[in-house]
């Protein structure tokens, strides 16, 4: 249990002297470019090599950062895998706004209060039939073709 990635370990002995070891690890959420560390679901930051996860490319204020992590954890894994880069991108109207670069060539504006809408990303992108553009889930729910 001294490994920072390990959440829990269970050891069970079964018939015929067989031992089963069950290891539960913390999920690696994203790479924080500001600290050059990977962020785990328990909000700890660790040094790792060769993990393919989204990259947070700029500073996020602590209160927004913690809320972002709490909301990000709830996203479907299939959606998380489509995110390439995460940028905190507030404007005068919305201090909770983020801009996501997606691996499929699209972009998404999202606000923390609507983060769960990202779970509908695949469904929304299917409806635009392969066109590339920006999905606005911050102030409205629409797709703008590039």
Locations of regions flagged by a protein language model:
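Soluble extracytoplasmic domains of inner/organellar membrane proteins
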Residues: 66-123
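Hydrophobic residues embedded in beta-strands of well-ordered beta-sheets
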Residues: 17-19, 38, 45, 96-98, ...
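Short secondary-structure junctions
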Residues: 2-7, 74-83, 128-131
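A mature extracytoplasmic/lumenal domain signature
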Residues: 13-15, 23-27, 52, 90-92, ...
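Short, well-structured beta-strand/strand-turn elements
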Residues: 3-17
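Extracytoplasmic segments of membrane-associated envelope/inner-membrane machinery
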Residues: 19-90
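Acidic/histidine-enriched alpha-helical segments
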Residues: 16-18, 85-88, 134-143
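Extracytoplasmic/luminal low-complexity segments enriched in Pro/Gly and acidic/polar residues
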Residues: 111-146
